[in-house]
From Swiss-Prot:
Identification of the protein by name: Transcription factor MYB48
Keyword Electron transport: no
Alphabetical UniProt keywords: DNA-binding, Nucleus, Repeat, Transcription, Transcription regulation
Gene Ontology molecular function: any one: DNA-binding transcription factor activity
Amino acid sequence: MMQEEGNRKGPWTEQEDILLVNFVHLFGDRRWDFIAKVSGLNRTGKSCRLRWVNYLHPGLKRGKMTPQEERLVLELHAKWGNRWSKIARKLPGRTDNEIKNYWRTHMRKKAQEKKRPVSPTSSFSNCSSSSVTTTTTNTQDTSCHSRKSSGEVSFYDTGGSRSTREMNQENEDVYSLDDIWREIDHSAVNIIKPVKDIYSEQSHCLSYPNLASPSWESSLDSIWNMDADKSKISSYFANDQFPFCFQHSRSPWSSG
């Protein structure tokens, strides 16, 4: 009883680990109470065994468990429960304490996942997808509104109900018959006008007599002038000039 109270507790030092390894090589890993007495470590047999099995054994594996080892731990625990030493025998290089620590960590993570129904990653992805969808919809609406305001027609437009502005524009484009005839007259004037301009330019070089207006008054004046000329001619021949001509030029068949 006094001997147990004099045993040392707490963390192992490097000198204690070296001393324990040497005595285990001498006497094997079975007689832990004897090793604890003869080594002078002032440790219990149980403490020496746990130190050897969990930390100093040369066949121990270091590092994280592989996925195959984790799956085997879950299967064996479902079969045997919390019998960690028995489970450790099926996993060479893994200690019962290491297997127990892995199991507790696994159950703690599983409980945290149940308390948190929606993970931040999934919620962030959902928010991102919804924001992208909203941005795409707003962009399409803005582009459609800009095409309507600018009057452009998109390749994807399939017709449909026309706006009031387009119908009013078509009504404004309808012409009446008077407008059509007015446009024709205006076109005719524009066509004839260049010809008139050509002759006006040539008139600077050539002078033409003024033509009489083909009215009825001018026609009557010309008729009266013709009558006056006839009267002059008749009076002219009434003189002795014509007989004088006959006196000088007698016919060959006249006698004398």
